[in-house]
Amino acid sequence: MSLRFIYGRAGSGKTRFCLEEIKSRITSKATHPLVLLVPEQFTFQAERDLISVLGTGGILKTEVLSFSRIAYRTFNEAGGITYPHIHSAGKCMILYRILDKMKGSFRVFSKTADRQGFVNTLSTLITEFKKYNVTPEDLEKVSKELEEDNPVKEKLMELTAIYDLFEKTIAERYRDPDDDLTLAAKKLGSIPLYDGAEIWIDGFTGFTPQEYQIIGQLMKKAQRVNISFCTDCLDGDLNDTDIFSSIKTAYRKLVKMAKENGIPVEPSVVLNSKPLFRFSQSPELSHLEQYLYAYPYKTYNEKTKDISLFSSVNIFAEVEACARDIVRLCRDRGMRYREIAVVTGNLDGYEKLIEAVFSEYGIPCFIDRKVDIVNHPLVRLIMSMLDIFIENWSYEAVFRYLKTGLTGIDRESIDRLENYVLACGIRGSCWTETEEWKMVPELIPNEKSLEEAKELLEDVNRIRAQVVAPLMEFRKKTKGRKKASDFCASLYDFLCTLGIPEKIEDAIEKFRESGNLNLANEYSQVWNAVMEVFDHTVEVMGDETFGIEKFARILEIGFGECKIGLIPASLDQVLVGSLERSRSHEIKALYILGANDGVFPPAVMEEGILSDQDRAVLNNAGIELASDTRTQAFDGQYLIYRALTTAGNYLRISWSIADHEGRTLRPSLVVFRLRKLFLNITETSNILPSGSLEEEMELLSGNSPAFKSMVSALRQKADGKEIKPVWQEAYRWFAVQDEWRGKCEALRAAFQYKNLAQPVSREKIAALYGEPAVSSVSRLEKYTACPFAFYVQYGLGAKERQIYSLRPPDVGTFMHAVIEKFSRMVAKRNISWRDLDRDWCSEKVSEIVDEMLEKMQGSGIAASRRYTALTLRLKRVVARAVWLIAEHIRRSSFEPVAYEVGFGENGKYPPIVIELDSGEKIHLTGRIDRVDALKTEDGTYLRIVDYKSGGKDFKLSDVFYGLQIQLITYLDALWESGEADENNPVLPGGVLYFKIDDPIIRGNGRMTEEEIEKAIMKQLRMKGLLLADVKLIREMDKDIEGSSMIIPATVNKDGSLGKNTSAATMEQFKLLRKYVRKLLKNLCEEIMKGNVSINPYKKKGTTSCKYCSFLPVCQFDTTMKENTFKLLYDKKDDEIWSLMAQEEEE
């Protein structure tokens, strides 16, 4: 029996020495057992290293073990191997159950016990207690010794209670894997296992008390225990700031243990001879290893070749640069992928990018990490399915479930169902009611839309039944409080009903066929992992009954503890790992990614349940635990040292100056240290590209990335910039390769592309719009705003996805419909508007609103029934509007003669027919909200009123440009229809917009109710264009004195019209009529020609693109010379009249 230490600095050959010694024992035909003991995560690599030294035959004579494997072997020999272990998921479930029972008695943990993640943190702490042999009795003893006012006392008491109950619960049926080493240490001495063995312990920086116990037993049994340590020396004073401090502490403990057991300590094997084995070919890396944390230090003055720094504009560019350099090393220096490693302090932030970019560059890589199953589609399916019942069939839960891809419903059906559900606001009991869905995704459905939706409803109800059936079958079995066994059995049946096991097998096969072995490996483990969680749930929760919400929480805790370990799919791969798991042998080149402040080294973890102060209290009481945050910070320096000294030939350290969101990042202090050590260190960057040929050539590191870089370069050439000839040569190469020829042709077409919409043929126009073509005046206004938007919306019939919500247009449409119903009721009952009573108006409006809301199923407005305030506001606004209409009519001699006057096949009037030069005819349809009339000796004056819920002003310049021609066109149609009657001709009285609104009146608090009403009336004054006839205007507002409160007119004291009057003479109305007719004809000519140009307008600070839904379709971009706005300018009315007159003369 003896103990021997093998030590040396990083790269000195400690592992190789151990392997060579094992080889020599095998060569000398030693009969005693040979054991190599390494950390759990490095066993696979250690076996590979052993094979490389010994060959496949030698590996059979040597055991590569970890501490947990030694425990397993011990139980196998001494008994206890069949004792049921509890998984970490089961431990967390037990802790959740304990916390749930004890939460009423907590004071310290009363607020944190229910927080997500607390159970996992508590489980980690208990694991730490066990690794350091701390029992509940130890904690209780310390808590009793503390003063009553000590804040740690109560925390320790609560932890003791939790820990003690946990231990008792575990002892009933299980064994905690965290106890294995303690139990194994007790049994190891009584069995012959490893008697006379020679053991090499390699790769550790320190040990837990449990591991010390195992080592102590091995010392007593083995003929020799060899322990290798990475350190400069073993003696000397301990200093917390020494990067080898934890190793020297471990050495002292082991020596003390050996002496206590009478085991001799042999002279140490020192491997610090210069140059160190690993760095024999690189003086630079040797200098780095020697002086990284040395004070004082020597500088390296020559230009570095093996060490370089690289700063990148962002993380993606950093990973790309790394991939290009790896390709360069393999191509120019003959390195193998397995000789290269990538290490980062932020693996979570880099791993997806590394996978994607390395794949593009054809670099095989293995990312050394364990995969959480929480985000696996199978787990998301289970949790979202449970959420459906917990959240009462919320939209989010249902479609999280459906979009896992495991339900057996195709994506097209899911999309169709989702569109319907969003449009109709389906939720809650709507999913489970026995009646089929009959809601129509339309604001105010009519008979025609109901008929058209028949096919949609049949399809949607079929999909709905397919979705609901298995879910309701599961819910029927799990309604109310059930045992875990009932829940898990029902859940298993549910998964089998969906055919999940078969789907998982199919996915594994597809991944294997496509060469994606990592995903195949992951999927092959996930089903078993889920089944294990079910088993633990049943075992832990026993006969306790609970509801579905608690069951979901238990599963969530269980899945959160499940991680899948992956193994490399091939031998020749780049190893990618975190700073903590960066150990690897025979690495020639190392890339450090993300060498940023706070990442390299990683920021110290939060203190957790026990703060540094709490740990200090326990330490003073003789209880040893894991290191505090201060010690962890110093340990971080050792991690940096170990990482930077991993490679023997090449080291490249890179960092980004900005993250994904553009926030500034600082380089790590390590970077500044390297700049001090190496005064002439090679440093490059892609922040400001030099454009040199060498730099451009680096971009040709792989076909796919080279093609992308070539596209970027050729784009610059197309923009008139100079590029290197290499890119034209690259294009010629790609163009003759079969794999890339098609892409080059597409590229050529792309560079010739102009964002222009080509005219549509007459045949297609006829097919889209019919023969004769039918449109509306409002649509022609849309065509004026942008021909392409008109074509997409009305020609192709594109629509925005309807969302079940109350938007301003919905409110406006609804209020418009209420006023229409009210107006028809007044006319039907033959009631004069002048006789209406305000209370009666409010009462009838309220009845109409309630009646419409009752009928409106599946529209956004229907939801307002649940919001009393909104319903009341609708009633108030519409009641005010009808009362204001009545007040306008009372003040006027004009009488309403028609409501909702339609132009078209089923309207009161025939469609407005526009005959084109080609002989083609276009029928324009439309609807007038209200027509008022006044009979005089000269004829009947008509006034058209249009109700608007938004702010709509009348601008003559907008009429001139074609943006506001609707009311003038309607007036013209009525005017023309009445011109034939010579005895009573129809004459234009005006066109007006009536605003439906609930304005806020700003004034002092002393305003009377009458003053408030006047202010509201003035604010809601109609806007538009009137006939410039004082007599007629007085008929429109009999109370007018100065500025009218109801129409856009002012009468001066001398009886003339004021300058603020919006009016036109009879001649001007005739001119306007002719101009609009000509404008309509021109617009229709352009439509029938197939002009669908992307030509939006810009007027002052607004454009027709501002609220356009089709911008992603047209991709209008002002940086492209062919994409320009049609510039419109507001002009004075006199100038507009003059321009119209000029048009007429032409």
Curated annotation (Swiss-Prot):
Give its E.C. classification number: 3.1.-.-
Instruction: List, for all copies, the residue spans of the domain called UvrD-like helicase ATP-binding.
Output: 1-280
Cofactor comment? Binds 1 [4Fe-4S] cluster.
Q: Which residues bind ATP?
A: 8-15
Q: Which domain of life is it from?
A: Bacteria
According to the record's subunit comment, the protein's assembly and interactions are:
Heterodimer of AddA and AddB.
Q: What else is known?
A: Despite having conserved helicase domains, this subunit does not have helicase activity.
- What is the designated name of this protein? ATP-dependent helicase/deoxyribonuclease subunit B
The gene it comes from is addB
